[in-house]
């Protein structure tokens, strides 16, 4: 099975990008980020594989609305119970997007670093241009296995001191494991709280961590509705600000640097005001 649809040429062998989405702290929106970035990149025409590496606590299938189509998992591949093409679930909405789910009934110690590397290598052989790995929370063996084949990382955090401390720890571990291309995504930003000095601005968070900013996602109650429906925010017919922010982050991730919001613009439209709120600009 070769995923031949998509943007770019089909001579991208060896140019695949393997990106781990991680956080350190649970509950910051890492899986939501994986689903929305992956779907956005697929909608831009690229071949995308999403891999849920959170053994025993998988949720990526739910956020994508694919839970009823999971017949085999990565564990079944490791144990020789099925082939990779049998376990990969192709999204019916965007056929250049596929999901490889992980087992709900196993422990993280059932998969080795080598197992994960072999899985990623096999996925890359199918012609995917982007492989996004939803990393488990924490910094134990599950984290080490999930980052084994990644060349890049996106650290997801919120403007809370505990989440920032964990993100800093994760950044150090990524560097120690040879992953130097790291970007920051700050989730659940509340402009109203930033104005009142009740929340750190995105600029504060970025300066504390010293990581290039990929995007800032405003707090959005639509996330709950989106999760329950099994549809990423970026698929909403009427995009919310968080959906737009995820789409812009995805464009920046693939190298479309022209999608940064221009702070030098004399017009203070909605997006510039949001940028000012997020970055603490006057």
From Swiss-Prot:
Entry-linked SUPFAM superfamilies: P-loop containing nucleoside triphosphate hydrolases
A GO cellular component annotation in the UniProt record: cytoplasmic side of plasma membrane
Alphabetical UniProt keywords: ATP-binding, Cell cycle, Cell division, Chloroplast, Nucleotide-binding, Plastid, Septation
Superkingdom to which the source organism belongs: Eukaryota
Function text: ATPase required for the correct placement of the division site.
Family of the protein in this entry: Belongs to the ParA family. MinD subfamily.
Name used for this protein in its record: Putative septum site-determining protein MinD
Source organism (scientific name): Chlorella vulgaris (Green alga)
